[in-house]
Each structure stands twice: as C-alpha cells, then as structure tokens.
Amino acid sequence: MKMAGWKKKLCPGHHLWALGCYMLLAVVSLRLSLRFKCDVDSLDLESRDFQSQHCRDMLYNSLKLPAKRSINCSGITRGDQEAVVQALLDNLEVKKKRPPLTDTYYLNITRDCERFKAQRKFIQFPLSKEELDFPIAYSMVVHEKIENFERLLRAVYAPQNIYCVHVDVKSPETFKEAVKAIISCFPNVFMASKLVPVVYASWSRVQADLNCMEDLLQSSVSWKYLLNTCGTDFPIKTNAEMVLALKMLKGKNSMESEVPSESKKNRWKYRYEVTDTLYPTSKMKDPPPDNLPMFTGNAYFVASRAFVQHVLDNPKSQILVEWVKDTYSPDEHLWATLQRAPWMPGSVPSHPKYHISDMTAIARLVKWQYHEGDVSMGAPYAPCSGIHRRAICIYGAGDLYWILQNHHLLANKFDPRVDDNVLQCLEEYLRHKAIYGTEL
C-alpha cells in the first residue's frame, strides 16, 4: 500500500504520464541494482566499481584463504602471545593434521583448469595498473611435495608475470606429471626447456636457474626483475609490495655478498666431482680468473633483466661461470661475486663499505640456528619456534610476527608437515592485504 501511494504522489493521475513514470522507476531500480552488482571476473583494484566496499568484499570473499583450523591468524600476525601459544598447541595435535594433497589429486583436478583455478583461488587478473606495467619473472626449482609447489605458485601468481619451473630429473614421474598438469592451466607458466638432475651443493643447482634464465629471456613478456625460488620458500610481500620494492632498487640488484671466511675459501681451493653426491678431490684449482675477488652469499637473488642478460652473454661472466663449475656449492659464491664485478649491470663495488648481508638484501629471509639468541643481548633474532634442518629454521607460528617486520620479498624455510598454521596464516594475511591494502 505504501508503494502504491508513493507511485501516486510521484505520478499523479494522468495516464499519459504512466509510461514515463514507469521508465523513471526502471532507471532508479537499474541504478540501485548496478550499485550492488560486481563483475568479479573483470574487476581490478583501480576500477570505479572496486571503490565500492561491497565489491571489494565480494572479491575478497571469492578469493580469501582463511586458515582451515580454529586459530587466530590476525592475532598471530600481530604477535599476540596467547594466539601464538594456541596455534603451537594446535599444531601438536596429530589428529587435527591434514594429510598433504597428492600428485593424484592435482592430476585429477587439473583436468578442468577453470575449476582448478577457481577452487584453489588463484587471482586471475592484475590487481593494479602499476603491477600490470611491471611484470616480474620467476625461476622456480622444485623436486618434491607437489602441494608446497602449488601453494607457492598461487601465492606469487599474477597473470602479467612469467614463471619458469625447473623440475629435478630425478623426481618421481607422478610428481613431474602433476607439475606439468598444474602449469598447463596457465599461459604464463612453463616448464624449463632443459631439465637437469640436481645434486645438493653441486653446479646443477646453478644450471637449473641458468636454464630458466635462457628461457625467460626468450619469452615475449618484458619482465623487469628475476626472482628465484625453491620448494620451501614463500613470499612475505604481496605482488604490489614487490613491485614497489623492485622499483626502489632503480636497476640495482639485491643479494647477499660478503667477504668469505677461511673455511668458505676452501670451497674453491680444490676441485669437486659429482656422482650421486658431491665429493672433493686432491686437485687444486687455479686462482679465480683475472684474480677477481671472491665473495660469498646464498643461492637466492633479486636480479635485474640486464644482470641476467650479462650472466649469459658477457665473456667475463662466462669465464667465471666455467671456473666455479667444479667448486663446492657454487650457487653461494657465483651470484655474490658477480654482484661485485664492475662489468655487471646493477652491481656494487667490491669495497668493504658495500658488503651486503642476508639481512640487508631483500632476496630471502632466513633464520640461522647459530645466530639465534636473546635479541636484548645483541642476537639478530630470537630462537626458531619451529624446528631446524641443516641449521636453518623451519618456521613455526611464533616466527610469523618477526617475519612480517622484515623488508625481504620471500622467506625460507616453510614446511606444512612441520607447521601448517604459520603457512595458512601467512596465506590469509597476504590475500587480505592484496585485496584491501591493509593488514589482517
């Protein structure tokens, strides 16, 4: 009755006006419906529609990655000790632990790529023009644990970026097939054209990245920087935050590069040979080419496109590459030394003032067991709340607040078999920040 009275007031009694009145009502109704309608498939964060809180909420609800267990991720990311303790206790309850997703699961779900991407909640459009205009390249080296790989890919995925995946030749066939099935669902993710068997601490780890470098440079995507990852890495910044950090480098690279200790100098004093493992020989190596000063770091880098091009094409770089092939863990001194070489784009001088620690570089955040301690007594970080493997912390929920205070783009190591709560909370945090631009 009230609606009828309202119509009469708006359109008083003349039949000639009836059509116009109903048209007016239709326009009002249409505008109201459009106000609450969002085309999530074609939305981006800078579109007019996205300024609506309603649309933003709809998008987040369609893409959110909430922790599957009853833990307080917002509290954990803010360092709330009660929330952390509850998460650590929850992680100890074996009956609550979910078995990891299998190769077979991914082989089945990827038969329908659209269903796979929707169900696993991949972001399938650029979230801003700034990100669209600044594509990032990834070299992803993996050998096991298919769910870890898929979750890492989902966390760093953006349709404007480009991803090269290198799978260890020694990996099980079902794992290789599952990786192929996943990447077949994305036009900007591909398998490296040349695969090698990767042996711990040997040259093959570098060769895997070099193979991806060659493929990525041949891609049609005009990427600006290359990041390399392994299966235990995870981003701690959104893609938008990474773009901002990379732009601030202004063409420079960012990677650990320090003076080697005496023990590390032994890594290139003798030749090493590879069978199933790496072992030293009694054959001494010649000094580095052109007496180039050697530096040490780690396997991870943030490298400009020009740096990558010079790694592959510059004759001086190629001489050094050949020289380090029979050293121990060459990935930990090749990149660090090239970063101080004067002919390399984006490098820094070899002077001590330019030494770069892993905490100063933005490439990777790692918590080493022998550096852990009481921060009030000068230790660089508190003890690991997870466990240690090869003296590296596999993070637990108690580490997440500290992790998020750092400027690095990615952190290492994560393993859902050790603590899935920290990974789930990090996923939830990153997805919320990507959509809303704010923390949990």
Curated annotation (Swiss-Prot):
Q: In which pathway does it act?
A: Protein modification; protein glycosylation
Further remarks about this protein from its record: Was acquired from an ancestor of the African buffalo around 1.5 million years ago.
Q: What is its EC number?
A: 2.4.1.102, 2.4.1.148, 2.4.1.150
Q: One GO MF term, please?
A: beta-1,3-galactosyl-O-glycosyl-glycoprotein beta-1,6-N-acetylglucosaminyltransferase activity
What UniProt keywords apply to this chain's record, in alphabetical order? Answer: Disulfide bond, Glycoprotein, Glycosyltransferase, Host Golgi apparatus, Host membrane, Membrane, Signal-anchor, Transferase, Transmembrane, Transmembrane helix
Gene for this protein? Answer: Bo17
Lumenal face of the membrane: 31-440
Location in the cell reads: Host Golgi apparatus membrane
Q: Name one Pfam family in it.
A: Branch
Catalytic activity, as annotated: a 3-O-[beta-D-galactosyl-(1->3)-N-acetyl-alpha-D-galactosaminyl]-L-seryl-[protein] + UDP-N-acetyl-alpha-D-glucosamine = 3-O-{beta-D-galactosyl-(1->3)-[N-acetyl-beta-D-glucosaminyl-(1->6)]-N-acetyl-alpha-D-galactosaminyl}-L-seryl-[protein] + UDP + H(+); a 3-O-[beta-D-galactosyl-(1->3)-N-acetyl-alpha-D-galactosaminyl]-L-threonyl-[protein] + UDP-N-acetyl-alpha-D-glucosamine = a 3-O-{beta-D-galactosyl-(1->3)-[N-acetyl-beta-D-glucosaminyl-(1->6)]-N-acetyl-alpha-D-galactosaminyl}-L-threonyl-[protein] + UDP + H(+); a beta-D-Gal-(1->4)-beta-D-GlcNAc-(1->3)-beta-D-Gal-(1->4)-beta-D-GlcNAc derivative + UDP-N-acetyl-alpha-D-glucosamine = a beta-D-Gal-(1->4)-beta-D-GlcNAc-(1->3)-[beta-D-GlcNAc-(1->6)]-beta-D-Gal-(1->4)-N-acetyl-beta-D-glucosaminyl derivative + UDP + H(+); 3-O-[N-acetyl-beta-D-glucosaminyl-(1->3)-N-acetyl-alpha-D-galactosaminyl]-L-seryl-[protein] + UDP-N-acetyl-alpha-D-glucosamine = 3-O-[N-acetyl-beta-D-glucosaminyl-(1->3)-[N-acetyl-beta-D-glucosaminyl-(1->6)]-N-acetyl-alpha-D-galactosaminyl]-L-seryl-[protein] + UDP + H(+)
Name-wise, this protein is Beta-1,3-galactosyl-O-glycosyl-glycoprotein beta-1,6-N-acetylglucosaminyltransferase
Return the InterPro entries for the record. Glyco_trans_14
- In which family does this protein belong, per the annotation? Belongs to the glycosyltransferase 14 family.
One Gene Ontology cellular component: membrane
Q: What class of enzyme is it?
A: transferase
The residues that carry sugar chains are 72, 108
> How does the protein's chain sit in the membrane according to the entry?
Single-pass type II membrane protein
This protein's species is: Bovine herpesvirus 4 (strain LVR140) (BoHV-4)
Please list the GO biological process terms of this entry: protein glycosylation
PANTHER family per UniProt: BETA-1,3-GALACTOSYL-O-GLYCOSYL-GLYCOPROTEIN BETA-1,6-N-ACETYLGLUCOSAMINYLTRANSFERASE 3, GLYCOSYLTRANSFERASE 14 FAMILY MEMBER
Spans through the membrane: 10-30
The UniProt function text for this chain reads: Non-essential glycosyltransferase that can synthesize all known mucin beta 6 N-acetylglucosaminides. Mediates core 2 and core 4 O-glycan branching, 2 important steps in mucin-type biosynthesis. Has also I-branching enzyme activity by converting linear into branched poly-N-acetyllactosaminoglycans. Contributes to the post-translational modifications of structural proteins.
Cysteine pairings via disulfide bonds: 73-230, 164-384, 185-212, 393-425
